[in-house]
Amino acid sequence: VLFVVSEGRFNFVNRIRAWEQKHNHGEKVQGFVLGDPVPLASEELQPFINGACCASPTDEYKLVVLDTVGRSMAGMNENSQQDASAFTSMVERIQRELNTTVLALHHTGHNVTNRARGSSVFGADADTIIRADRQGKDYLVSLTMTKQKDAPEWEKKKFIKLSGVSLDLETKSLVAVKPGEDECPKGDKFHP
């Protein structure tokens, strides 16, 4: 996995350590690479591709995560069809050149929470869209598939729970875990 962190990079190492502690018995996770530099839709992509190839011991990734779309579009306009198309073209090139799947994390708008903020190009060009919604003030998050181009959509919501992991006396991080069936809302049928 190549994870390109452009938002929250300072604390990302703590998130990795917490995940390792919770899901990997405290052992370092293998095959996980932090990407640098952040690919920008407005710049030449080849330095990112070359860096990704050099950083991988096997020259291949099963997944590339871009966190976030907004940061990968620095200096561009998310509402512009032309700029959004430049971003989705960049994603397609990363997919093609690294022979991988790309997960681009994007925020919803402040007033419209049922779709990604910015141009409708993001939704139109995406193969799959999964919306994450925090359920109230607890740490339960529902995952709703709103688009799936080449396979059946999920029939039901899926859920994850954010669990606090203490790394030391002062440092704590949240990690996604599978919730118990009794932790999911009664109106939604649990679907692991």
What is each residue range found by the language model?
Residues 1-77, 82, 86, 93, ...:
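Conserved inter-motif catalytic segment of the P-loop NTP-binding fold
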Residues 23-25, 106-110, 191:
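Histidine (H) residue identity feature
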Residues 184-192:
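Short amphipathic alpha-helical interface segments
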Residues 14, 70, 116, 130-133, ...:
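Short, intrinsically disordered low-complexity segments
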